[in-house]
Regions:
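Hydrophobic alpha-helical membrane segments
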Residues: 1-299
Length: 299
């Protein structure tokens, strides 16, 4: 089918209208959020650890189709680089570098919502039209989602949880290392690994961080994809995540270990691996949701 060359002015006007429509729909979604907290409970499925292999395979397939590593390379890596550079000049920030980066496990479910939408759109196009549409523009459809307000509200809860984690991390540092900051990165590393207080900081800090990560995982493992996929209440989405984790403790624990291990391995080579690990895990989360929540069998 022949395509006509459009007037650039007309194209810009249409794009502005589309964005305005998305903003308007987002506003209506925010109003809808306040009156739609709980809805009918949903059925959750039992899965096995072996199912996680299929989930990761499909996530990697979406990653290769969209090449979302480029998005993370453009957006995420410069942020991490700026953080490291800032820490190198302001030594008081050094103790927060690890908590800030490791806290991505808390914010990850919210940050990944755009990639969930990309996987959802690709899945729909393959099923309905047998077309592999993998445009980056699919990510922008999140702003027009009927549950956009609920997604943002749940995301803000994770942001609050992330900030609480940073406050706890800083409090633990001061409790174990004193109120003064290290004079250099080398001094910080020395105090961390060669003093009793440093080892207490590592042990207790990892334990507290683990609790924050588990809380984020259990409450949001399917919540964000569910809000993208169906018109359900925010409370129902969170409760469905909790029920899915309760019904599948071993697979969900294994998934949490995969996420943690992937983030650690991705961060080792100067954080470069995160531009691959993070988008693959985000895409895979959509397919994990598909495994855990049946499409047409609600309770």
């Amino acid at each position: 089918m022949a395509q006509t060359i459009r007037n650039p002015v007309e194209w810009v006007v249409d794009e502005i209208r589309e964005v305005a429509g998305g903003v308007g729909q987002a506003g209506r979604s925010l109003q809808h959020t306040s009156t739609h907290l709980f809805s009918r409970p949903l059925t959750v499925s039992r899965i096995t650890v072996a199912d996680l292999k299929e989930v990761l395979t499909k996530g990697f397939d979406d990653f290769m189709a969209y090449r979302t590593d480029i998005i993370f390379l453009i957006v995420v890596y410069p942020i991490i680089s700026l953080l490291v550079v800032a820490a190198s000049f302001r030594y008081e920030l050094v103790p927060l570098v690890f908590p800030i980066v490791s806290g991505s496990a808390i914010l990850g479910p919210f940050v990944g919502v755009f990639l969930y939408e990309m996987s959802r759109r690709r899945e729909l196009n393959l099923q309905r039209h047998h077309i592999d549409n993998h445009s980056w523009a699919n990510a922008l459809s999140v702003a027009r989602a009927r549950n956009f307000g609920k997604i943002m509200m749940l995301g803000m809860l994770l942001v609050v949880m992330y900030l609480l984690w940073l406050v706890c991390a800083w409090g633990l540092y001061q409790a174990t290392q004193g109120p003064t900051t290290a004079e250099s990165v080398g001094r910080f590393v020395h105090d961390l690994f060669l003093t009793q207080g440093g080892w207490w900081l590592i042990i207790v800090g990892c334990g507290v961080g683990f609790l924050f990560a588990v809380a984020a995982l259990v409450t949001t493992v399917v919540a964000f994809p569910l809000l993208l996929d169906r018109d359900v209440g925010l409370g129902t989405a969170v409760l469905t995540s909790i029920r899915a984790a309760r019904a599948n403790p071993v697979p969900i624990a294994a998934w949490g270990l995969i996420v943690a291990g992937g983030l650690i391995l991705g961060a080792i080579p100067l954080f470069i691996g995160l531009v691959i690990v993070m988008p693959v895990l985000c895409h895979a989360t959509w397919h994990l949701y598909r495994k855990l929540v049946p499409r047409h069998h609600d309770a």
